[in-house]
């Protein structure tokens, strides 16, 4: 054990970073640590955060307090004359006035100014220098600084020296509550975005994911203004040909698993843009679910959780081994790590125009085909719909699937109306001859208890056939209800599962279930119909 005098000298040495002035942001704290290394942030976290520790695998373990997930009902966007007509107002983008924003901003600054030291991280959002956003994060917790060190694109020494003024600033005062009596506040949590000021204010939540999604929300506003499609998806590229593809899908559809392909480079796992020059990742890292993680289920993620990574809200055993099955704190345990920790990652995280765009859905009704080819109109319709379904709990012997519709497969982060993103997708599809596919990773031959889950082996074979071009030449037949072209053959996939009605023993039950699902699609689309073109409306299922 080191003598206490040596420990004191060592700990004081990590405080001796060059002062950084944040007075332009209204902050007067004398000690500001800018872009500390992971090693230094580890030491700060262990010293200054009560519950921080180092896991056996080397990752920093931190806890976000009472909030262990996003707080979408507490997100506000300033209603400003310059942008109010652009924004899709409603439960996703709840308006607040400029005065309320300034009250919350000042409250955050007042709190941050009471801290003995602050952490500042300057980095980039977007791997294409032509479109990247300079982001500054100001926070009071080393855990938050390390998290954004992993999630933003880390500048070189030269880039940091010439960084200049940021284009977007996050003030994370999440340890301090919002005043719930302030106009429009629903709780002591507030995540306020001003598009005009290019600032995000966080109060009353220490969940790190709010910062990541704040950056994505800003990208979702500014990218379409430049003719760039921002997307909530993963992206990969063939190691030999460089041909890229996009994978969209909500939670539980297999997006993460299917993106891990030894034949392909990972461009990114969550947030991307499609410009006139190709695709690029917005982020410099990955933020993966850690629940029930094993080296067998997700080997890439498991090995990436090491020194330099952050493990959030996990439970450790006495020897600091991580118990990924323990959900005592939350089901939403997470791990954040730099993308270069993935062996198959392509750096820089850019690629050419995608050859294929894949929408994943886990259809628990057992109605949708394992794979279908979509026209531009059908692609826009299903992109706006963003459908998947989960198996509900069984009560009195009845299992009823629960549908989820999330527009553009990323509803909580959209700023414009979903049709804006759908039109950009169709435009880029047509311009760059991208094929679009709907892949069902859910059930066939019936729903749960009657049919069978489509095997991962068969889904991987479908994805392989999409990527190698063979599925584009396969025979198809039009689905009488949904109207898209169902692939009737696919290499290494049994033909009997490809046409869903044929896979059901009870044809009448299939027809009734297909009609029911079509009705759910149509009811959901009523929300978007007013802004949709006649072409997109015509792509709706026929009941």
Regions found by a protein language model. Give the residues of each.
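N-terminal accessory targeting/assembly segments
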Residues: 10-161
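Glycine-rich, often acidic-flanked micro-motifs
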Residues: 17-59, 66, 224, 232-250, ...
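Gly-rich Lys/Arg/Thr-decorated short loops/hinges at beta-loop-alpha junctions or inter-strand turns
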Residues: 88, 194-199, 402-408
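Carboxylate/His-rich catalytic cores and anion/metal-binding grooves
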Residues: 163-184, 208
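Charged, amphipathic alpha-helical linker segments immediately N-terminal to NTP-binding catalytic cores
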Residues: 183-222
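Conserved lysine of the Walker
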Residues: 255
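A cross-family detector of function-defining hotspots
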Residues: 270
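Generic C-terminus detector
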Residues: 502, 509, 513-543
């Amino acid at each position: 054990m080191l003598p206490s005098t040596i420990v004191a000298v060592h700990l004081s040495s990590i405080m001796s970073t060059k002062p950084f002035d944040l007075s332009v942001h209204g902050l007067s704290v004398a000690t500001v640590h800018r872009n500390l290394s992971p090693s230094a942030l580890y030491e700060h976290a262990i010293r200054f955060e009560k519950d921080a520790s180092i896991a056996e695998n080397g990752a920093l373990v931190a806890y976000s307090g009472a909030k262990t997930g996003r707080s979408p009902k507490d997100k506000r966007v300033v209603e400003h004359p310059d942008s109010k007509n652009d924004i899709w107002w409603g439960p996703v983008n709840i308006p607040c006035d400029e005065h309320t924003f300034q009250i919350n901003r000042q409250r955050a600054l007042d709190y941050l100014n009471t801290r003995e030291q602050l952490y500042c991280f300057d980095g980039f959002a977007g791997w294409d220098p032509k479109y990247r956003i300079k982001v500054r994060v100001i926070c009071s917790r080393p855990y938050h600084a390390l998290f954004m060190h992993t999630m933003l694109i880390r500048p070189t020494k030269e880039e940091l020296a010439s960084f200049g003024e940021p284009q977007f600033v996050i003030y994370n005062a999440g340890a301090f509550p919002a005043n719930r009596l302030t106009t429009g506040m629903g709780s002591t949590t507030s995540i306020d975005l001003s598009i005009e000021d290019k600032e995000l204010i966080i109060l009353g939540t220490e969940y790190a994911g709010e910062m990541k999604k704040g950056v994505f929300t800003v990208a979702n506003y500014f990218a379409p203004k430049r003719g760039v499609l921002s997307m909530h998806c993963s992206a990969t590229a063939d190691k030999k040909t460089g041909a890229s593809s996009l994978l969209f899908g909500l939670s539980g559809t297999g997006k993460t698993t299917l993106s891990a392909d030894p034949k392909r480079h990972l461009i990114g796992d969550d947030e991307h843009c499609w410009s006139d020059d190709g695709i690029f990742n917005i982020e410099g890292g990955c933020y993966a679910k850690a629940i029930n993680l094993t080296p067998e289920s997700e080997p890439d993620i498991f090995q990436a959780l090491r020194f330099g990574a952050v493990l959030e809200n996990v439970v450790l055993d006495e020897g600091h081994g991580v118990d990924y099955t323990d959900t005592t704190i939350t089901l939403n345990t997470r791990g954040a790590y730099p993308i270069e920790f993935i062996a198959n990652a392509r750096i820089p995280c850019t690629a050419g125009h995608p050859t294929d765009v894949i929408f994943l859905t886990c259809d628990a009704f057992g109605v949708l085909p394992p794979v279908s080819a979509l026209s531009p109109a059908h692609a826009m319709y299903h992109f706006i719909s963003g459908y998947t379904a989960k198996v509900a709990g069984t009560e009195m012997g009845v299992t009823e699937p629960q549908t989820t519709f999330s527009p553009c497969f990323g509803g909580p982060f959209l700023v414009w109306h979903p049709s804006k993103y759908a039109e950009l997708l169709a435009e880029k599809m047509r311009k760059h001859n991208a094929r679009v596919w709907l892949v069902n990773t859910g059930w066939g031959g019936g729903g749960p208890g009657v049919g069978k889950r489509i095997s991962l082996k068969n889904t991987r074979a479908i994805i392989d056939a999409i990527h190698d071009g063979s599925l584009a030449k396969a025979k198809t037949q039009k689905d009488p209800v949904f109207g898209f072209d169902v692939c009737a053959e696919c290499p290494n996939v049994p033909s009997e599962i490809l046409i869903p009605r044929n896979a059901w023993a009870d044809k009448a039950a299939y027809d009734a279930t297909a009609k029911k699902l079509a009705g759910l699609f149509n009811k959901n689309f009523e929300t978007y119909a007013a802004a949709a073109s006649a072409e997109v409306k015509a792509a709706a299922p026929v009941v």
